Design a protein with these regions (language model features):
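Structured, helix-rich domain cores that form ligand/interaction pockets
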Residues: 1-296
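Helix-turn-helix DNA-binding helix
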Residues: 298-304, 309-314
């Protein structure tokens, strides 16, 4: 039996259009207080990214994105579960019922944190720029997550969809990411990801995580809000949580429309040879299985071209 839970993993707030000089004032002040460090920069030093340290409670990260000559911005990355519970648990997700006013709390924390500084952060300037809707699938330890991830990766997709790879065989086996116009779908082995960071999930759980990261334009369209500004961030999170199932299920159904038992190629061949008694049907099934397998490995397009979708019933 598959146990699944759905919730929200990460949200982001963003203040855009800030000049290089105005951001430098903030950076200098935080450096004096030893509350900031340089995360990365380009070779010309015209683009820098800073993260704060020991400024906010666990669950809030402030990231300054400084660019020249283009304007930069300030990004707040929030883990609602960590913030509301006071502790970081890798596999846990946030549900709006845990703290219905979590975003109002975040805005107050941001405003009050810098009350004594010469510069201010106006919460009214912050927009809800990203929401990560998430599913955790708790599977039995006998299930090979890399095989499920492979099926997702080679599922049908549009030509305009970009498939990200990590250029690392192990990471590519345990995760993949697809980028659409204003959404990103990430599927990965949660235990593998956490282990890479030197942590562990509880009870050696075999967790397949599916994340749908929605930019502002995407979630506004999904909720049919157009350009409304009279709705609170907490209300947006609640409505997205209510639609979590439909939104993620749409992408899962599109990538993997088939149902039933999924097997590696060699095991599938043996199943067909042992269980399909009619020679002509067995021959056709083995033929299509071989064609699909070759298509997914030699062409790199999964099931997107050449052959139409086929389903077998055994």
């Amino acid at each position: 039996m598959i146990v699944a839970e759905r919730g929200i993993h990460t949200v982001e707030l963003y203040w855009q259009g800030l000049s290089f000089a105005s951001l430098q004032m903030i950076v200098d002040d935080l450096y004096d207080q030893k509350q900031i460090y340089l995360r990365k920069k380009n070779h010309l030093n015209t683009s820098r990214v800073y993260d704060t340290a020991n400024v906010f409670p666990d669950g809030i990260i402030m990231r300054i994105e400084q660019r020249y000559p283009e304007p930069g911005g300030i990004r707040f990355i929030i883990n609602p579960y960590t913030l509301s519970s006071g502790k970081y648990v890798p596999e846990e997700l946030y549900y709006p019922t845990m703290d219905p006013s979590i975003m109002e709390h975040v805005l107050n924390v941001i405003k009050n944190t810098f009350n004594d500084r010469e510069w201010k952060i106006d919460p009214q300037k912050l927009t809800l720029s990203r929401v990560d809707l998430t599913w955790n699938f708790y599977l039995s330890n006998e299930i090979d997550l890399t095989e499920i991830i492979r099926l997702f990766k080679h599922g049908q997709r549009k030509k305009t969809t970009k498939l990200d790879t990590f250029q690392d065989k192990s990471k590519d086996q345990h995760s993949f990411r697809m980028r659409f116009s204003d959404t990103t779908l990430t599927v990965y082995d949660k235990e593998f990801q956490v282990t890479q960071k030197g942590l562990r999930v509880g009870d050696n759980a075999n967790i397949l995580r599916v994340e749908l990261s929605m930019q502002r334009r995407a979630y506004m369209r999904s909720l049919e809000l157009k350009d409304r500004t009279d709705i609170s961030m907490d209300e947006v999170l609640y409505r997205l949580y209510q639609k979590n199932y439909d939104l993620i299920h749409h992408y899962i159904d599109f990538l993997c429309p088939c149902t039933g038992k999924h097997l590696p190629y060699q095991k599938a061949v043996k199943e067909i040879e042992n269980q399909v008694n009619q020679p002509d049907i067995r021959e056709k099934m083995l033929y299509f299985l071989e064609k699909y397998s070759l298509q997914g490995t030699t062409q790199g397009n999964g099931l997107t071209g050449g052959l139409p979708p086929v389903r077998f019933s055994m």
